[in-house]
Structures are given as C-alpha cells and as structure tokens.
Swiss-Prot record:
GO terms for molecular function: metal ion binding; metalloexopeptidase activity. It comes from Coccidioides posadasii (strain C735) (Valley fever fungus). Its cofactor is Zn(2+). Belongs to the peptidase M28 family. Residues 82-432, 509-518, 572-575, 732-743, 799-1012 are vacuolar. Disulfide bonds: none annotated. The active site is at residue 261. This is Vacuolar membrane protease. Keywords: Glycoprotein, Hydrolase, Membrane, Metal-binding, Metalloprotease, Protease, Transmembrane, Transmembrane helix, Vacuole, Zinc.
Length: 1012
C-alpha cells in the first residue's frame, strides 16, 4: 500500500513526524504557516542554540543566575559589616574609641549602681582630655585656627515629676527622677555669642542648634556595649571631630550623654528641664537593641532631616521600621520619643537591631561587637551631624508643632530605604501617593486600550475559545482560554502549604526560628518553588498553553492592583509608607503584562488562522491530552474531515511488524511517545523544537510569538522584587526572629516569612513551567532536609541563647525570700531544675502570662546587697496621720510619706487603690508631661542622684475611696558587679545551661518590700 501524501489526512505528531508532515504541507501551501514562510532546516539549529529563547535551558539558567546574583549580595550586606578604615579619618581616632568602649563596658553600670557614678566621672575626664587636645591642636595649627567655645555642663540640678503608662482607664505610674546628665555645647560659628542660659528666663537667639544623644547607663544584666556604649563613644568622637581644626560647626552642636534611659527614658526627660533643651531644633539619637552588626536608621520625623543621613558612607534601614512604631507593632521606645513627642524636635533614630538574644544580657559586650560596628555608627553620625550643623536654611525654624515645644517647624512625611547598603533613596510621601494613584488609573486604561486594538485587529487570542469562519459559519478552536484559572489555583495551593508549614513549626518546634532563621527561609522557599513547578508542569502536560505567561501576569497585576489600592489608602489616611515596595512591584508587573499583550500583535488574525486550520487541519488538539483524555470541545475543529488516513511516520504494519511501532513507546497512562519524545524525556525536558517554532503541544498559532521577550518580562519584575522584598524580609527576620523569649507569639513570625517567601518568588511563576527538573529536584531535597531539621533540632545554642528574666523579692512582713525566673515553658522549669538551691525546693509557677511565658518561684539564697545591716533595716519609711480637706466634689485626704533605703537610690511606693495626686517638695513639674491624670496613680517610682536619700512624698486620695492609705514600700538593688552580693543570681549564672541568657525582669534585681 502506498503512503498517503494528502495533507488533509496528515496527523502532525512530535519529532520527525511533525517535520515531515509540515514539510509536505509547506510544499503544497506555503501560506499555511502564520508567518507566511515555510520553516527552514537551519532555523531549528539556530533556535536550539538561542541563549535567551523561552526554552527550559535558558529559562532555568537565567532565572537562577539573576536570583543568585541579587540574593547573595543582599545576604552579604545584611550579615557583614563594612570594614573600618585602616588609618584614622581626619578628626577621628578609632583606636581611642575602641579603648573607651572597653573601659565603659568593663562592668554593669545601671543608674542604680556605684559603677554608674564611676562612669559619670570618667566621662567628664574624657571630655576634658578631648577638649585639651583640641585646644593644643588649634595652637599648633599652621593656619592659625581658633578653638571654638565649648561649654561642659555636669547637670546635677535638673529633676522632674511626671507620669507614664496608664493605657485607657488604667491607673498611671508616677515618677520622680533626679538627673545626672553630661551636656557639651560647641558654639557654632554663626551662633549668638552671649551665654544666654546664665540669665534667668534667658532664651536663645538665631537658628536652632543640633542635638546628638546617647545614654551611658546600662541595664543591670548587660555590659551595654551596643546599648548604648557604641553610641557613647561615638558622641565622644563627635566632640573630638567638631572641635578639630577645619571641622568647626556653623550651627551650634549640643552633645548629650544622658543617664537613666533604661528606666523609662528618665535621662531624656531630665534634659527637657535644662535651658539648652530650648535651643536645639534637630537631633540624632544613637541607640542599640542588639549586639554588633550594622546600625540601622530606625525611624525619622520627616524627610527634611532624613536627607542628611543620605550622605552616610554605608546607609542602612527602611521606613518599614518607622511605620512599625506608628502602627504599634513595635512596643519598645527610645529617647527619640521624648525629643519628638515632648520637645518637638525633628530628627533621626539610629540603632543596632540584632541579635535580640544578646540584648540586655552579658553578651552585650565588646567580644560580641567589633570596631567595624563602631565605625558604621560613627561614620553615619559624622555624616548626618555634619550635614545638620552646616545647613543654614530656615527649614527647621518655623512654628512650634505643639504647645510648649520649640519652634522647629513642621516636616514632611517621607519614604526612605537603602539599596545594598551603599546608596539611599528618600522622597516625599506625597510623591509616592501621586505615583500610586497614577499607576492605579493609567495602567488598566492602557491595557484596556491595547485589548480593544487587538480585538479590532482580530488578534485577541486571550479569552478566546473558538473563531467562526464568516463564509461557512464553521467554528474552529483556537484554545485561547487554556490556562486562564491555572495560576490562582497553583498560587493558592503552593502558598497554602507555606501557611500550613508555619502552623506546623509553631506547634511542634516554635523556637527554631530563634537560632535557625535561614533554615526556615530555606524550607519555605524550596517548598514553594518545587510545588509551584510541579503543579505547573502537570498543568502544562495536560493542557499546554502559549498564553500561560500572559494569564499569569494578568492575575498578578490584578492582585497587585488591589494591594496598591490598600497601600494608597494607608498612605493617604494614615501616612503609612511601609507599602512603598508595592508601587515598584506593581510597576514591574504592569510592564511585564504589557509585553504579553504586545506580543499578540505578532500573531495572525484569528479569522485567517481559522480558515487555514479548516483547510489544513494538522492535529486533533494536544497529543498529550488527547492520548489520555478524549479531545475537548475547544480542541476539535468543528465540521472538519478527520476520517482520512492518518500518517504516523511508520511503514504499513504487516504480520512481521513489532507490536509497538519503531518510534513509539507506551509511557505514563498509556500515553504513546515517539522516539524523539523519549529522547527529550531522557535528557530532562519534554520540549519539541519543531520547524514551526511551536513549543511542545502548545497552540499552533503561537509559532509567531517572539521567544526572547520573556527575558524583558523577568528583568522588569525579578530584580525589583528581589531587591525590595529580599531586603525587607531579612530586616524583619532580624527584628522578629528572637522576640519569642519576650512573650511574643512566633506564629506571626513564621507567617511573615511565608508571605515574604511568596512575594519573593512570585516573579518565577510565569516561567517556572519551563524549568528543567534539576533545580526543583535539588530544592525538594533541601526542603526535606530543612523540614526534618526545623522539626527536630534543639532551638537554642550558646550563640543564640534563650533569654529568661530574673528577680529576687524579699517580703519583710513575712520574711519570705523568693527567687523568680520568668520564661517560656517548659524550658524555664528545665533551667530551674539545673540550679542546686532549687533542686530540693517546691517550685511554684504562675499560670501562663503571655504566649507560653510563666513565672516560676522558689525559696532562694539570701541576698547580701547591704553590708553589716540586718535585713529589716534595709528600707525604712513613715507615714503621717491623714488629714482631710474639703473640695467642691468630695472630701480629700492628705498624708506625707518619708521613704529611704540602704545602699540604694531607687525605691517605689505601690498603692492598693489609686490615689488622686502626689508631689515632692522642690520637684519641677512640666505641663508637657503631666504628673497625674483623672484615672489616678497606682505607683510612684523614686530615683535620686544621691545614695540613701530620704524622699518626701505628699499624696492625696478621695475619702470616699478609702479611709486609710494602704500599700507597700519597695526599695530596689541593681548592682551585680560584686560577686556574692546577689548569690542567687551568681548561682544561676554558674549552673544554668550554656544556651540560657539572664536578663532583668524589673527595675531591680533585688526588691525588698514592706506594707503599710
């Protein structure tokens, strides 16, 4: 029997069959092909070696390289601190700064410690030595420079009574504090030459100055290297820099070393009572909430001051952190809150942010920081301060932002972020809003117009099922609807798995992120990539579609449009700029989607294609799907003649023929492959680079689609997303991965990592079905390994310790001596069992406090914080007999308390029921910080600059509430420098497991109380 050569009876198959079939057709009708030209043999070779074609090899390699090329630098920037210069920059001595840091952190120095007094005197001496060296440098200067006027204030007078806390209707906490701040004022070249602060009621003239602040007190359980030792030595170096020849400031510079920040920002509040607080209009606050690493720009008041940080050699930070404070997601505070909220200054908060496990512990020391970290903060401080003191405009000399505040003007909300730690972007929030609104309106219109044009040109293959031939009314399938709902299903399934993994980790091993955040990231990323690839390949196997990219980008654009709407609303109504990355994400997605729509112009019009298909039907739909399932309605050409002889590229079968054809083998689900199919499969792909340019079993009209535009699409979306999402994801992980010890639920951390993993990898979705199996298979192995590790590994180590919180409480009324540890259950009980003195005691644990934290107590070793005194004499107080006073509303009772403690300068008075008012003779009051509120005062904290001070406290309460005053007087001891003063703490440090870090629970390490 002769082989049929009638093209109407040819079923075009894969491999050589397709070539033979199409060659026969092209000989009869070259116009059959959408391009109008029959393919040439050489085109296959060129396409096969096209390095940017939309084929598995280039897609896998290019996508992987782009991700690696951007993620690796992001990781390096995030984990490696830029090296300090080998030689000292002009006006700075890094060796001197490092030596100062070593001396400062040689012991614990909280406000309520004798070491704190020693540090105070040492700082005064250091300032004096720096100024002496500066004067000598000016005398030796060949240019004949004149040393600036510098004034050093050892503020031993400022005190203040104020209140804090009291959310809603809850009673507030009253505070009396006596400051011990050190203030250095360097007179600017353009400053008023009069010492206006010496005159009662004197006021500064001219432009406002610049304040740089750091606090020199530490917590009682931390050496304070980064909190805030690096800030302190940076201030000392700023004094050195701005008093050196050639560096004199044009505007006055105030450098504040405040004492008492760790105890509710008391030092900054005391500064508000000093005359110089009226002079400064801008500020730079140097802080630390970690141990080493890079100093991040944590938050700023406005764009005008933020621009001066831009000149930092290694800027680092994002507006996301600032918005975290605005939305109440970050609960800790710094002196920034006082300078901005009370004084009305405009400025910046620069702080170390990781690792939080070392924050307020004995690992906040010089061994866990570096000279590089010192230089990172110092260089940023020099650049920012230099810009502020050199600025002579009137930007910061406007109307006061509030009552009692300085005339610093009102700033503009801004957006800011760094790029790879080397450049810094800053622009107005209104600009972000304008761009967002423009994109929201213009982008849909552009796509709508293009869609109309494509429809007019009869090239809108998207959303098309079939095309009707006008002459015969015959309907021909174009299969343009294929893949429409593929992407949302895949996205939901793949992302849902990550959410499930988040819940799994939070349930089985919630603290693994504490020490192994990168393992969690690896698990999330590898899981999403493999599952998305697997589902995409299944969909492409059964229903291949050349419109997969177009539909995927369209769905992504729709989702990003909704997110951009939400972000724009927050920008407009709440001044929240944290969604700035969505603007760039949306813009890149729009450009990629636009390219997919523009590609359709290269296709033949649908009517012509339908005529050609009707005249020369080439196949019954997809070979893959049709061999497994019956052809669907959109795959069969209506009315076509499909009963002719089918040519499959093999000889007519005879009695001696093989049961299977030479080129055909049965595979999955009896799907018959040709020899070339099998070869492709064995090489890791199932592609078919036929002469027509159609990939695999995709729609025949797709031969006219360009094969290189995917690179543009990926470059529009991929790098932008990686840079922004990668940076923010790492930043958030560093800030959040170790908050579980503080009582914060870790599920939100895992979900945040899952969400950022999805956002980071979404750019791969339109292309991932073209990946070869090598990368996904490797990532499957990574996923399995990291999943097992994350579920089974112990979450703490000597480098990433679990923080527990210590306090010892002694009740003089009952003689009860109780040591308490607060931490995460069950670890806190495991730790207590390792303590010898607790091994035979009855351990009592309170009910769960927050997110698994419990307070467990036992009778502990007696404290020795006061030498040669019996315990019952460690604190003393007396209360005068209440006296009444009639008011318009209700009778008020008065009483006077005298409170004192041995070897301490911190006590407090707790009341069983809130009192109405209180006062201390000689204390300053400030309307900007009211000392009482209508809901009353439940506690008064007392701080003195002198040891064993006697506080006199007058209190008032409503007679109808109580006839007599009831409560407790508590005195605090926070000095743990001397071994043996707090034996229970010494024992805990000696016997606790190496994966445990000890921090303070309350203001005092030891608290002794007596009732009244």
């Amino acid at each position: 029997m002769r082989r049929s050569t009638d093209p109407r009876n040819l079923l075009v198959r894969r491999g050589p069959l397709l070539v033979d079939g199409e060659s026969a057709i092209s000989e009869l009708d070259p116009g059959f092909f959408p391009t109008g030209d029959a393919p040439k043999m050489s085109s296959t070779t060129r396409r096969r070696f096209n390095l940017i074609a939309f084929t598995p090899g280039p897609v896998t390699v290019i996508s992987s390289l782009v991700y690696l090329a951007l993620l690796i630098p992001l990781l390096l920037v995030h984990t490696i601190v830029p090296s300090a210069p080998k030689s000292n920059p002009k006006g700075v001595d890094l060796s001197e700064a490092w030596n100062d840091l070593q001396h400062l952190t040689s012991g614990f120095h909280p406000y309520n410690s004798h070491r704190n007094d020693e540090i105070h005197q040492w700082l005064l001496q250091r300032v004096g030595h720096i100024l002496d060296a500066s004067r000598k440098a000016h005398e030796d200067d060949a240019m004949g420079s004149v040393a600036p006027d510098v004034f050093v204030f050892d503020d031993q007078q400022s005190n203040l009574t104020f209140s804090g806390g009291g959310v809603g209707n809850k009673p507030i906490t009253g505070v009396y504090f006596e400051g011990k701040n050190i203030i250095v004022y360097i007179r600017g070249l353009e400053d008023d030459k009069e010492n206006w602060w010496d005159s009662p009621g004197g006021k500064p003239k001219g432009k406002g100055g610049v304040l740089v602040n750091a606090h020199y007190d530490s917590v009682s359980t931390g050496f304070g290297a980064t909190d805030d030792g690096v800030g302190v030595v940076s201030v000392l170096q700023l004094i050195k820099f701005f008093t050196s020849p050639g560096n004199l400031p044009r505007k006055g510079l105030v450098l504040l070393l405040n004492n008492g920040e760790e105890d509710y920002l008391n030092g900054a509040r005391a500064y508000s009572q000093h005359p110089l607080s009226k002079y400064t209009h801008t500020f730079l606050n140097l802080e630390g909430a970690g141990a080493g690493g890079r100093a991040a720009l944590f938050r700023t008041t406005d764009i005008e001051v933020t621009r001066f940080y831009k000149s930092s050699p290694h800027p680092f930070g994002s507006v996301l952190a600032a918005d975290g404070f605005k939305m109440g997601l970050i609960r800790s505070e710094t002196d920034y809150a006082v300078f901005k909220g009370v004084l009305g200054l405009r400025g910046l908060d620069v702080a170390f942010i990781e690792p939080r496990a070392r924050y307020h512990t004995d690992q906040d020391d010089v061994r866990h920081t570096s000279i590089d970290s010192v230089w990172h903060m110092l260089s940023a401080a020099i650049a920012t301060t230099k810009g502020l003191v050199s600025y002579t405009g009137s930007e910061f000399d406007g109307r006061a932002p509030g009552k009692g505040m300085v005339n610093s003007g009102v700033g503009t909300h801004g957006v800011w972020f760094d790029l790879f730690g080397s450049s810094f972007a800053v622009f107005r929030l209104h600009t972000l809003f304008a761009i967002s609104v423009t994109l929201l309106v213009v982008c849909p219109i552009v796509l709508f117009v293009i869609g109309i044009i494509l429809s007019k040109m009869d090239k809108m293959y998207l959303f098309s099922i079939h095309e009707t031939i006008p002459e015969t009314k015959e309907k021909v399938s174009v299969r343009g609807l294929r893949g429409l709902f593929r992407y949302p299903i895949i996205l939901v399934v793949s992302s849902g798995i990550l959410i499930g993994l988040s819940y799994l980790l939070a349930k089985v091993n919630p603290f693994i992120v504490h020490s192994s955040s990168y393992a969690v990231w690896s698990m999330m990323l590898s899981s999403w990539i493999f599952m998305t690839w697997f589902l995409s390949c299944i969909a492409d196997f059964f229903r291949p579609s050349a419109l997969h990219r177009a539909y995927t980008f369209t769905w992504q654009l729709l989702v990003m449009w909704v997110l951009l709407v939400i972000s724009t609303v927050y920008v407009n109504q709440h001044d929240i700029a944290a969604g700035y990355f969505i603007v760039f994400y949306f813009a890149g997605t729009f450009l990629a989607t636009l390219i997919s729509y523009l590609e359709l112009f290269a296709l033949p019009n649908k009517t012509r294609y339908a005529r050609e298909q009707s005249q020369y039907p080439s196949r019954l739909g997809s070979n893959r799907s049709s061999r497994i399932l019956s052809p669907s309605a959109d795959e069969l050409p209506t009315g076509g003649d499909n009963n002719g002889e089918i040519y499959d590229g093999e000889e007519e079968p005879t009695e001696s023929s093989s049961l299977l054809g030479r080129q055909r083998r049965t595979t999955f689900a009896n799907y018959t492959r040709t020899g070339r199919d099998l070869a492709s499969s064995e090489s890791g792909t199932y592609e078919d680079h036929s002469e027509t340019g159609v990939f695999g079993e995709e729609q025949k009209w797709s031969a006219s689609l360009p094969t290189w535009t995917w690179v543009l699409q990926f470059l529009f979306v991929g790098p932008v997303v990686i840079m922004f999402i990668g940076q923010l994801g790492l930043f958030l992980t560093s800030a959040m991965n170790q908050v579980g010890a503080d009582g914060v639920g870790l599920l939100v951390v895992y979900i945040a990592i899952a969400v950022f993993s999805v956002l980071l990898l979404i750019p791969l979705s339109p292309f991932i079905h073209r990946f070869t199996y090598h990368v996904p298979t490797f990532l499957l192995l990574v996923f399995i390994a990291t999943l097992i590790y994350n579920l089974a590994a112990f979450p703490f180590s000597a480098e990433n310790r679990l923080k527990i919180f210590f306090v010892q409480e002694l009740n003089l009324d009952t003689g009860r001596n109780q040591v308490s540890l607060t931490g995460v259950d069950p670890y806190v009980q495991d730790i207590i069992r390792a303590i010898p003195s607790a091994s035979k005691e009855n351990i009592s644990c309170d009910s769960e406090l927050d997110s698994g934290r419990r307070k467990c107590s036992w009778p502990g070793l007696a404290p020795e914080v006061v030498q040669d005194e019996p315990t019952d004499r460690w604190l003393s107080f007396n209360i005068s007999k209440p006296s009444s006073q009639e008011t318009k509303d209700t009778p008020v009772l008065h009483a006077r308390l005298h409170v004192s403690g041995k070897n301490t300068r911190a006590c407090r008075v707790n009341f069983e029921r809130p009192i109405r008012d209180y006062s201390l003779p000689g204390s300053a009051l400030d309307d900007r910080m009211p000392h009482t509120l209508p809901q009353g005062i439940s506690e008064i904290r007392l701080w003195s600059r002198t040891w064993e001070n006697v506080w006199t406290v007058d209190v008032q309460w409503d007679a109808e509430d109580m006839d007599e005053l009831h409560g407790r007087v508590v005195c605090l001891w926070s000095d743990a420098n001397q071994l043996g003063s707090i034996p229970a703490l010494d024992e805990l440090r000696l016997f606790a497991p190496p994966w445990v870090a000890i921090s303070k629970l309350k203001d005092g390490l030891v608290e002794v109380s007596r009732g009244f």
